[in-house]
Amino acid sequence: MIVIPKLPLGNFASILRVIDKCGGYAELITSPILLRKADKIILAGVGAFDYGMTSINSMWREELENAVLVRRIPILGICLGMQLMCKSSEEGHLPGLGWIDAKVRRFSWSSNLNLKLPHMGWNTVKIVKSNPLLEIGNDEQRFYFVHSYHVVCNNPRDVLATAHYGYDFTAAINHENIFGVQFHPEKSHRFGIQLVSNFLRL
C-alpha cells in the first residue's frame, strides 16, 4: 500500500490524481500506525521547515523512522518533504530528520543577476547519476519548481539530479531507500507522471 501522511502542509489532491493516472492507489492517512502497512511512502509538503518538523515530531516521527530506517520502505519526499529529510535548514531552528547528510540553504546570488524568489516555474533537470527513479527517456527533463531554499548534500553520491537557477543546485537525491525531489512531479505533466510511475515500481 502507498501511504501519504496527512501533514497540514501538502497539496495531496494533485498527488493522489497523478498516482491514479499511473494505475496506483494511495491512501492519505491521519494515523501514524497505518505506516506499518506501507510498502511505499510519499512525504509531501509546502511551507516552512520548522512547521513541517513540528508536525512530524508531534505524532509521526517514531512510526516514520521505523518504516524508513528499520523496515527500509522506499520513501519519496516532495519539495519541503525532501528538505525535511536533511539535517537542518537556514529557514528554521529545529533539526531535520537527518536521513540525508545535507543542509537546506536559501538561494543567494550577487545582485546583478536580478533573479527573484521563489524560484517558480519550469526548469530543466539534468541527471548526474543513473537511478530507476529518473529513467524517463533522456538526460534532460523538465519539471515544475516552487521554492526559495535548496538542499546542499555533503556527500555528492547522494545527488541524483541538478537544475540551474543562478547556479547549479540539487534537484533530486537518493540514499538507499530514501528519495527526494525538490520539484513538484504532480505539476510536471508527462515527466512527473513517469517519475511517479517509476517510484511505484521500485
Question: What kind of region is each of these model predictions?
Answer:
Residues 79, 147, 184:
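Histidine-centered divalent metal-coordination motifs
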Residues 1-74, 103-108, 191-202:
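N-terminal beta1-alpha1 cap of cysteine-dependent amidohydrolase-like domains
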Residues 150-202:
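C-terminal and late-domain segments of enzyme folds
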Residues 41-44, 68-89, 97:
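Catalytic nucleophile loop
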Residues 88-165:
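Pocket-forming structural segment of enzyme catalytic cores
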Residues 74-77, 96-97, 117, 142-143, ...:
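A residue-level structural signature of the nucleotidyltransferase/glycosyltransferase Rossmann-like core
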Residues 48-51, 83-93, 183-185:
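A short secondary-structure junction motif
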Residues 3-6, 144, 179-183:
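Active-site-proximal beta-strand elements of phosphoester/diester hydrolases
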